[in-house]
Amino acid sequence: MSTSDFEERVVTVPLRDANDKPIQERADFAMKIVREHLAQHFSVDEAEVVLDTTVNEAVWANGRQNPPSKVRVRAARFVEDGEPVVEAEYAE
């Protein structure tokens, strides 16, 4: 693996669009927003984004009805088995 195959960044993901959804779907949709945002900014498919449980806990901390307006994640992009993969964890 060369140095160009690895990239790590701290990304702030805005989640305010989750408030446009019904109350019962907000945290679920917020998790989808995180995955879509990272896939777009790291140029990979959504299926290649792996979220750590700390991201899930941060989004669901206030319950299903009230996700945070934004969340900061530390994401790393690297190549595994010839496929680009993004792994993300919560950045405090």
From Swiss-Prot:
Lipoprotein recorded as keyword: no
Molecular functions per Gene Ontology: structural constituent of ribosome
SUPFAM superfamilies linked to this entry: Ribosomal protein L31e
Single GO BP term: translation
Superkingdom field: Archaea
Classification via Gene3D superfamilies: 3.10.440.10
Keywords of the record: Ribonucleoprotein, Ribosomal protein
GO CC, one annotated term: ribonucleoprotein complex
HAMAP family (alphabetical): Ribosomal_eL31
Family, similarity comment: Belongs to the eukaryotic ribosomal protein eL31 family.
NCBIfam families: PRK01192.1-1
Protein name: Large ribosomal subunit protein eL31
Gene source species: Halorubrum lacusprofundi (strain ATCC 49239 / DSM 5036 / JCM 8891 / ACAM 34)
